[in-house]
């Protein structure tokens, strides 16, 4: 059950803390698509007159968006290598809702000679929807379409800019005995390319 007042109270509290860093010249970098969507779009919709929330939303970037931006402005650190086996990137719903383009794919293109396939179907997870007993079967049914595409692409890696969606899709893949590696966040593949 949604609790908008609790969300608003937390948004006010958290935005005040994060703005201390923004005022020092930092940007807020989110590691998951759902967090980015919340800070950039949902909090401003819930609290449209709150100046702290407005300022924070303008200074927030998704990690994939941030790395792509750095690569364009300053370039990447030397030492990025290839990754064999290809990757299927699940472009999560919460990332698509941010209207920033597919930054996970764009970031992974920074890896030399990488084969990338993209899936833009809902994973079905939807936060707690995918784990609650009463809705888990529906979440699985919704995610089957994306899972089938991932299985068909048969890449070594599967990555999603939403870790929960990635894990949900991985669970659906395990139900079919596919043998690709664990579900990763795209930034983990960048780390792998740097041998970190």
Predicted regions and their residues:
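Iron-sulfur cluster-binding electron-transfer modules in prokaryotic oxidoreductases
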Residues: 1-196
């Amino acid at each position: 059950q949604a609790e908008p007042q609790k969300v608003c109270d937390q948004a006010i509290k958290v935005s005040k803390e994060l703005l201390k860093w923004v005022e020092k010249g930092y940007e807020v970098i989110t590691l998951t698509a759902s967090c980015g969507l919340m800070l950039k779009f949902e909090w401003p919709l819930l609290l449209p007159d709150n100046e702290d929330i407005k300022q924070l939303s303008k200074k927030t970037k998704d990690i994939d968006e941030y790395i792509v931006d750095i690569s364009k402005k300053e370039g990447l650190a030397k030492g990025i290598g290839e990754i064999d086996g290809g990757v299927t990137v699940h472009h999560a719903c919460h990332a698509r809702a941010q209207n920033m383009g597919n930054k996970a794919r764009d970031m992974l293109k920074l890896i030399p000679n990488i084969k990338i396939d993209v899936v833009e179907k809902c994973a079905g997870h939807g936060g707690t929807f995918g784990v609650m007993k009463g809705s888990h079967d529906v979440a699985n049914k919704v995610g089957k379409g994306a899972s089938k595409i991932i299985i068909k692409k048969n890449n070594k890696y599967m990555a999603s800019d939403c870790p929960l969606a990635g894990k949900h899709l991985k669970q659906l893949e395990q139900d079919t005995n596919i043998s690709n590696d664990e579900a990763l966040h795209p930034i983990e593949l960048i780390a792998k390319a740097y041998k970190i």
